[in-house]
Amino acid sequence: MENRWQVMIVWQVDRMRIRAWKSLVKHHMYISGKARGWFYRHHYESPHPRISSEVHIPLGDAKLVITTYWGLHTGERDWHLGQGVSIEWRKKRYSTQVDPDLADQLIHLYYFDCFSESAIRKAILGYRVSPRCEYQAGHNKVGSLQYLALTALITPKKTKPPLPSVKKLTEDRWNKPQKTKGHRGSRTMNGH
């Protein structure tokens, strides 16, 4: 019988970032209690030899599964040492892969306190509102002018340690374009 291949999107991530993300997840599961209901599966509990860990995040009757891998083929850079992350949304027998932005938005719908658009109406009507969002990674759009004005009144409280963001876990910090700060150069080289 022929081998059957299944292709998955795996985000290449360096091992220190995966390690930091795992410790943030464990902290908020076991110490702060903000990730109540999440399930962490260790590498020795998985039958697959390349799976380093799995985090199962319940989202109503569905769940988000963030799987970290080790021992993968290395990328084109030296620091891509065979570590990776896949993000999957599962409901009963159906599963699909999602990108880090959508994963953060899904997490934000079910977990962590937020100062949402509905708070604008409550504030105008004179009700007390809590203008803080604990999970900023779940917002990927600019809010309305009223929303921005109300959030400008009270600065968001920084949580220590930060909440685990899937987007932050998978972001490519190695291949970002370099920014030059105030580089003047010689007058002959830049045309002056």
From Swiss-Prot:
- According to UniProt, residues marked as the site described as Cleavage in virion (by viral protease) are L150, T151
| Reported induction | Expressed late during infection in a Rev-dependent manner.
Q: Which keywords does the record carry? A: AIDS, Host cell membrane, Host cytoplasm, Host membrane, Host-virus interaction, Membrane, Metal-binding, Phosphoprotein, RNA-binding, Ubl conjugation, Ubl conjugation pathway, Virion, Zinc
**In-chain residues carrying the UniProt-annotated modification Phosphoserine:** S144, S165
Annotated region Membrane association: the residues are 171-172
The UniProt annotation puts the region (Interaction with host APOBEC3F and APOBEC3G) at: 54-72
Q: Where is this region: RNA-binding?
A: 75-114
GO MF annotation: an example: RNA binding
| Location of Phosphothreonine modifications | T96, T155, T188
CC per GO annotation? host cell cytoplasm; host cell plasma membrane; membrane; virion component
**Where is it localised?**
Host cytoplasm; Host cell membrane; Virion
- Keyword Zinc among record annotations: yes
Record motif BC-box-like motif, residues: 144-153
Q: How is this protein situated with respect to the membrane?
A: Peripheral membrane protein
Q: Where is this region: SOCS box-like?
A: 151-180
Kindly list the biological process annotations in GO that this record carries: viral life cycle
Q: Where does Zn(2+) bind?
A: H108, C114, C133, H139
Which stretch is the leader sequence? none
What residue intervals hold the motif HCCH motif? 108-139
Q: How does it assemble?
A: Homomultimer; in vitro and presumably in vivo. Interacts with viral RNA and Pr55Gag precursor; these interactions mediate Vif incorporation into the virion. Interacts with the viral reverse transcriptase. Forms cullin-5-RING E3 ubiquitin-protein ligase complex (ECS complex) by interacting with host CUL5, RBX2, elongin BC complex (ELOB and ELOC) and CBFB/CBF-beta. Within the ECS complex, Vif interacts directly with host CUL5, ELOC and APOBEC (APOBEC3F and APOBEC3G) substrates.
The miscellaneous annotation reads: Vif-defective viruses show catastrophic failure in reverse transcription due to APOBEC-induced mutations that initiate a DNA base repair pathway and compromise the structural integrity of the ssDNA. In the absence of Vif, the virion is morphologically abnormal.
> In UniProt terms, what function does this protein have?
Counteracts the innate antiviral activity of host APOBEC3F and APOBEC3G by promoting their ubiquitination and degradation. Acts as a substrate recognition component of an E3 ubiquitin-protein ligase complex: mechanistically, Vif hijacks a host cullin-5-RING E3 ubiquitin-protein ligase complex (ECS complex) and the transcription coactivator CBFB/CBF-beta to form an active E3 ubiquitin-protein ligase complex that targets APOBEC3G and APOBEC3F for polyubiquitination, leading to their degradation by the proteasome.
Family of this protein: Belongs to the primate lentivirus group Vif protein family.
This protein's domain notes: The BC-like-box motif mediates the interaction with elongin BC complex. The HCCH motif (H-x(5)-C-x(18)-C-x(5)-H) mediates the interaction with CUL5.
Q: What is this protein called?
A: Virion infectivity factor
Native source species: Human immunodeficiency virus type 1 group M subtype B (isolate YU-2)
